[in-house]
From Swiss-Prot:
The gene is bioB. Pathway: Cofactor biosynthesis; biotin biosynthesis; biotin from 7,8-diaminononanoate: step 2/2. It catalyses: (4R,5S)-dethiobiotin + (sulfur carrier)-SH + 2 reduced [2Fe-2S]-[ferredoxin] + 2 S-adenosyl-L-methionine = (sulfur carrier)-H + biotin + 2 5'-deoxyadenosine + 2 L-methionine + 2 oxidized [2Fe-2S]-[ferredoxin]. The lineage of its organism: Bacteria, Pseudomonadati, Pseudomonadota, Gammaproteobacteria, Legionellales. GO terms for molecular function: 2 iron, 2 sulfur cluster binding; 4 iron, 4 sulfur cluster binding; biotin synthase activity; iron ion binding. Belongs to the radical SAM superfamily. Biotin synthase family. One of its GO terms (biological process) is biotin biosynthetic process. Catalyzes the conversion of dethiobiotin (DTB) to biotin by the insertion of a sulfur atom into dethiobiotin via a radical-based mechanism. It holds the Pfam family BATS. It is an enzyme of class 2 (transferase). Its EC number is 2.8.1.6. This is Biotin synthase. Its cofactor is [4Fe-4S] cluster; [2Fe-2S] cluster.
Length: 315
């Protein structure tokens, strides 16, 4: 049985996650070096192509129509606008261009326009990723026809804690969409958010869910919550840095071939904490000044840090 086909148990993951920190880092970094270049990062850019007024009630999200936040509603961008942003992203060093829309599920009438975006971005030589909410099998097939490389659909947290964060959909709805994406032949990008009020046990169950998928996600984004004023989680306690590193290291051990993306929350991290995350197995980041609606480290800050650490762009 291959590493990716192993069925992990909670006790397996507890033993990994809770071992002495130095032992955990050593194990994770050893695996990381086996499967990846430890001194290279994948650069991606994320663009909000349709912003705000989402009917879902995710307790962390600035784009939910249930809460009054700083986000202003914006309609779906034109293909031309998206392609201009993609060109700028490529000039800035991005290799993958991710497009996010604040929908529960995309309206069928938008699919032709979305397909044009995919085709246009691919023609620039960029990998494509979309996150549009729940997808039917038919919609996933249409996106695949256009050449979509990745679809992001995060499970956010553990199955046990999920309904404390979102009530307008079920955890099983997330899994259904992931199955539709996988069946269409699109690579899966799936991770979650730390700092939603979950326990360590929830984080372990969250990792168990990802690692025990029939095929683990090719890309696993790990977000550190950016509290947004106006949302139910605006005052959530920030997850400790060491806990973040433990989560990344455990993800690397459980899913050795996956890209582990250090995503939201980097603006609040010290250089030293980011360095630990990369040592533990994170090998992908979003570059640019925005992550959908929230700030991201400015390019020059990223460049300075990556130069200090000797990290280069993944070829």
């Amino acid at each position: 049985m291959s590493e990716e086909k192993k069925q992990w148990s909670i006790s397996d993951i507890e033993a990994i996650y809770q071992q002495p920190f130095n032992d955990l880092l050593y194990q994770a970094h050893t695996i990381h070096r086996t499967y990846h270049d430890p001194n290279s990062l994948q650069f991606a850019t994320l663009l909000s192509i349709k912003t705000g007024a989402c009917p879902e009630d995710c307790g962390y999200c600035s784009q939910s129509g249930h809460y009054k936040t700083h986000v202003e509603k914006e309609k779906l961008m034109s293909v031309e606008e998206v392609l201009q942003c993609a060109k700028e992203a490529k000039e800035g060093g991005a290799k993958r261009f991710c497009m996010g829309a604040a929908w529960r599920c995309p309206p069928d009438k938008a699919i032709p326009q979305l397909k044009e975006m995919i085709e246009g971005v691919k023609s620039l030589g960029l990998e494509t990723c979309m996150t549009l909410g729940m997808l039917t099998k038919e919609q996933a097939s249409h996106l695949k026809e256009a050449g979509l490389d990745y679809y992001n659909h995060n499970i956010d947290t553990s199955p046990s804690y999920y309904d404390k964060v979102v009530t307008t959909r079920k955890f099983s709805d997330r899994l259904d969409t992931l199955n539709n994406v996988r069946s269409a032949g699109i690579n899966v990008c799936c991770g979650g958010i730390l700092g939603l009020g979950e326990t360590r046990e929830d984080r372990i169950e969250f990792l168990l869910t990802l690692a025990n998928m029939e095929t683990p996600p090719e890309s696993v984004p790990i977000n550190r919550l950016i509290p947004v004023e106006g949302t139910p989680l605006a005052q959530a306690e920030r997850v400790e840095g060491i806990e973040l590193v433990r989560t990344i290291a455990t993800a690397r051990i459980l899913m050795p071939k996956s890209a582990i993306r250090l995503t939201a929350g980097r603006t609040e991290m010290s250089d030293e904490l980011q360095a630990l995350c990369y040592f533990a197995g994170a090998n992908s980041v979003f570059i640019g000044d925005k992550l959908l609606t929230e700030d991201n480290p400015q390019r020059f800050k990223d460049k300075t840090l990556f130069n200090k650490l000797g990290l280069t762009e993944m070829v």
